[in-house]
Amino acid sequence: MSIIKVILVGNVGRDPEIRYVESRPVASLSLATTEKAYTTANGAQVPERTEWHNLVMWDRAAEIAEKYIRKGTILFVEGKLRTRTWEDRNTIKHTVTEIYVENFDILSRQ
C-alpha cells in the first residue's frame, strides 16, 4: 500500500472554472505556494520561489468553490496527487499534474 497526500496553503491564482461531467460539477483552479527568500548559514542568498498547482474539485466542493472562491483567496487544501496525459487536436501529447481536492478550508476571501 502507498499513500500520496498533499497539503498546501496558498493563494488562488484565478477564479474557478466550472464545467459538468455527466451532470457532476467540476471546478478547476490554480493555487500559488511561495517559499520566502532567506539567507543560509554561510551567507548565501536564496531567492523567493513560487510554485503553481492545478486543483480539481468535484461535486459539493465544486459548488462551494464556484460560490465563494475567487482570485486571491487563501486556501488550505488536502488532496491526492494525480498525473494524466491527454492529446490535443494536433495529436501532441501533454502531461499535467493535478491535486484532486479531498478537503479544503477558506482562510481568507478577497
Segments from the language model and where they lie:
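Single-stranded nucleic acid-binding surfaces, predominantly the OB-fold ssDNA-binding core
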Residues: 1-110
